[in-house]
From Swiss-Prot:
Descriptive protein name: L-lysine 4-hydroxylase
Keywords carried by this UniProt record: Dioxygenase, Iron, Metal-binding, Oxidoreductase
Gene Ontology molecular function, alphabetical: 2-oxoglutarate-dependent dioxygenase activity; metal ion binding
Positions of Fe cation binding: 174, 176, 310
Named cofactor requirement(s): Fe(2+)
Cofactor comment text: Binds 1 Fe(2+) ion per subunit.
Highest classification ranks of the organism: Bacteria, Pseudomonadati, Bacteroidota, Chitinophagia, Chitinophagales
Listed InterPro entries: TauD-like_sf (IPR042098)
UniProt function note: Alpha-ketoglutarate-dependent dioxygenase that in vitro catalyzes the regio- and stereoselective hydroxylation of L-lysine, leading to (4R)-4-hydroxy-L-lysine.
Gene3D superfamilies in alphabetical order: Clavaminate synthase-like
Amino acid sequence: METIIESRQRINSPGVLPPPLSPLIVDVTPKERASISNVANILLKAFGHYEHPDFISALHLNAFQLLPERIAGILSRFGTDFSRHQYGALVFRGLTEVDQEALGPTPPSWKETDYSKLVKYGFICSLLHGAIPSKPVQYYAQRKGGGLLHAVIPDEKMSHTQTGSGSRTDLFVHTEDAFLFNQADFLSFLFLRNEEQVPSTLYSIRSHGDTNAIMAELFKPIYKCPKDANYADDENAGEEVTTSILYGNRERPFIRFDAAEQIYNEKAGQTPEAMHNLVRFWDEAKQLIYNDFVPDSGDLIFVNNHLCAHGRNSFVAGYRNENGQLVKCERRLMLRMMSKTSLINIQSVTQLNDPYFIMEEHYGKLFHSQQ
């Protein structure tokens, strides 16, 4: 008779299950959705803002006590699962209702965002991170901080850039802030609007299966990554630090990767060996990109930033396709939150009096003048 241990070994043995090629999609029930909305309203009355110190300090307790049990359980397991079968992303379909009238028109860019209209959504996103458990943080490298919640809006002035404000070119898959050693551990993307019906793209290092010869070359610390298009060219100059693309366990690696900046940016300055390895890897990775999910209003994508890269297809902001005709609509609006599982490990790169504010500029270098 087969023992439990033998059964588990058989199930987990190589070749039994194929590598994951898509995220787990969780359909949130009407009861769960109503519960989450009610909880957010209660927290809004109690604390006023999702950045209130008393709320943030008790975030994990609030998350496990207040979120629907199924949702909290899914996130808690997700936070500790780095296995061969873990894709590294979750989709919560229909997480929350969005009052489009109360939201008002989408502003021209993130700079004009009225965050007073988004406080409830900030509570919802932070609770999800709290259930990992992980702590929302902000980065000086991203909008000089800008708070724990960022509105991501297509900006016509940046439409051709490889940033969240772009639209007219595909945003290549990337792990968030691949030019930092202390990049976010987890990301959430809450879609308030996506009337243009833009697919979100995801790519998981787990989709390759076991580490192959091409991937093994990416453990070498020979790769450069400039800061992204949010920075001027002179701010990107002279970045000579090199690091690996893959790190951690060699059989179940993590990834730090930005195709746009490390491969397509001519100023990256990769060595011939590094570029050769990157191009070979990218040829494989491109075949594994998932872009079958088109977010609707109220959907949320939750990502392990060490396992899964994200991006989006190109689109014409403010227009949707109806029977082959472009029809004007409200421009897309998404909310991003980032978090770290430990504040202890990042204290050397945070503001002295704010352990949630990360001051890393590029691979360990700090924005010293802003401390």
